[in-house]
Amino acid sequence: MQIFVKTLTGKTITLEVESSDTIQNVKAKVQDKEGIPPDQQRLIFAGKQLEDGRTLADYNIQKESTLHLVLRLRGGLNVKVRTLTGKEIDIDIEMTDTVDRIKERVEEREGIPPVQQRLIYGGKQLADDKTAHDYKIEAGSVLHLVLALRGGNF
């Protein structure tokens, strides 16, 4: 089947894919056509960032669907946010991002308001006004997400 990938410059790339293709496969096809390394690609469909190991079928992407390609900034790094259910969310951050900004990224992906999020790294709860750099968060780091009950102060 054919799908389309639209870049931020407005260019549309046509790809021949199968619904069983993984997002990683799709990124490889984008690389073949455009020369953009997969690790710099972020594919978005219906407002959600698509995860490499999932398939087009997992996201109900059908023929003639349009994905949006966003390039990851150099200097950015990918971290994982692990929920209490064990689900891992991949998030791109910059070293200069505040914890509050990281929480906004979690909200974009999961719909959880930042005020309800507590992020833990290295056994410490992270303060909203501190940066990833302050906590020495690096690529591949795993942050733990705990939900704060409304009205509960920790």
UniProtKB/Swiss-Prot annotation:
<keyword id="KW-0677">Repeat</keyword>
<keyword id="KW-1017">Isopeptide bond</keyword>
<feature type="cross-link" description="Glycyl lysine isopeptide (Gly-Lys) (interchain with K-? in acceptor proteins)">
    <location>
        <position position="76"/>
    </location>
</feature>
<dbReference type="InterPro" id="IPR038738">
    <property type="entry name" value="Nedd8-like"/>
</dbReference>
<feature type="cross-link" description="Glycyl lysine isopeptide (Gly-Lys) (interchain with K-? in acceptor proteins)">
    <location>
        <position position="152"/>
    </location>
</feature>
<feature type="cross-link" description="Glycyl lysine isopeptide (Lys-Gly) (interchain with G-Cter in ubiquitin)">
    <location>
        <position position="48"/>
    </location>
</feature>
<feature type="domain" description="Ubiquitin-like 1">
    <location>
        <begin position="1"/>
        <end position="76"/>
    </location>
</feature>
<dbReference type="Pfam" id="PF00240">
    <property type="entry name" value="ubiquitin"/>
</dbReference>
<dbReference type="GO" id="GO:0031625">
    <property type="term" value="F:ubiquitin protein ligase binding"/>
</dbReference>
<keyword id="KW-0833">Ubl conjugation pathway</keyword>
<dbReference type="GO" id="GO:0005634">
    <property type="term" value="C:nucleus"/>
</dbReference>
<feature type="domain" description="Ubiquitin-like 2">
    <location>
        <begin position="77"/>
        <end position="152"/>
    </location>
</feature>
<dbReference type="InterPro" id="IPR050158">
    <property type="entry name" value="Ubiquitin_ubiquitin-like"/>
</dbReference>
<dbReference type="GO" id="GO:0031386">
    <property type="term" value="F:protein tag activity"/>
</dbReference>
<dbReference type="GO" id="GO:0019941">
    <property type="term" value="P:modification-dependent protein catabolic process"/>
</dbReference>
<protein>
    <recommendedName>
        <fullName>Ubiquitin-like protein-NEDD8-like protein RUB3</fullName>
    </recommendedName>
</protein>
<comment type="similarity">
    <text>Belongs to the ubiquitin family.</text>
</comment>
<dbReference type="InterPro" id="IPR000626">
    <property type="entry name" value="Ubiquitin-like_dom"/>
</dbReference>
<dbReference type="GO" id="GO:0003729">
    <property type="term" value="F:mRNA binding"/>
</dbReference>
<dbReference type="GO" id="GO:0016567">
    <property type="term" value="P:protein ubiquitination"/>
</dbReference>
<feature type="propeptide">
    <location>
        <begin position="153"/>
        <end position="154"/>
    </location>
</feature>
<dbReference type="InterPro" id="IPR019956">
    <property type="entry name" value="Ubiquitin_dom"/>
</dbReference>
<keyword id="KW-0539">Nucleus</keyword>
<dbReference type="InterPro" id="IPR019954">
    <property type="entry name" value="Ubiquitin_CS"/>
</dbReference>
<keyword id="KW-0963">Cytoplasm</keyword>
<keyword id="KW-0832">Ubl conjugation</keyword>
<dbReference type="GO" id="GO:0005737">
    <property type="term" value="C:cytoplasm"/>
</dbReference>
<dbReference type="InterPro" id="IPR029071">
    <property type="entry name" value="Ubiquitin-like_domsf"/>
</dbReference>
